[in-house]
């Protein structure tokens, strides 16, 4: 028999596409910040095909839309900005994550493996960039479900010729409510070189974590610190880059401490899942590099 293992909840890597389309005015907000009038549609796709495995975090997909009108509600207005003169982007997104065991075809529960889990989240977020201090503050409010309601098993059935039977043992339905805040500060900004540090905290019934990281870029980098670029020269966010073709290499490393992870430990309210991982068997500290 296998020895009892330890389980980690590792933030997933993303492949993101950022097609954008811009307008030409910049309305002012209260508190001397600004709302970007540019709009973006973002596709994030994560799959274990990139790592050559088919277990644990096995698939994730997210659709995001950024528009200035999403800032016209109470929740968005309550999210903090990076400071006086900050440029704010408001958006909504929907995300689904899938987690499977190392043997998805197993017909019995293996207490030494991780549980199957599906996550479905809707999100309102605000990305606030203070260019004068090269500071970016991102805040997210997330609401969703873990369990069969996430439709993870249904989607994987459509995608796989052989359906993983282990979904019958997935973590049961429960409500997820999460807050996430991250801050990134650029410390080196040269013509072809960037270095920044970041810190991230999550609190809620899905993930409760704290982490920090370092990020590096080198190449033909965009001139500004903005997380988004636009080709519309009639907006203040237009960079007027010295090169038509931008390219860069990047590297990053970080450490995360996990206090709670519903995809391993089960939902906070529904404690009837057939398999969960006890707290003492969790690896709390995760170190990542890319």
What are these model-predicted stretches?
Residues 1-33:
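Cleavable N-terminal export/targeting peptides
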Residues 25-38, 69-88, 130-138, 187-195, ...:
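Short loop/turn motifs that connect adjacent beta-strands in outer-membrane beta-barrel proteins
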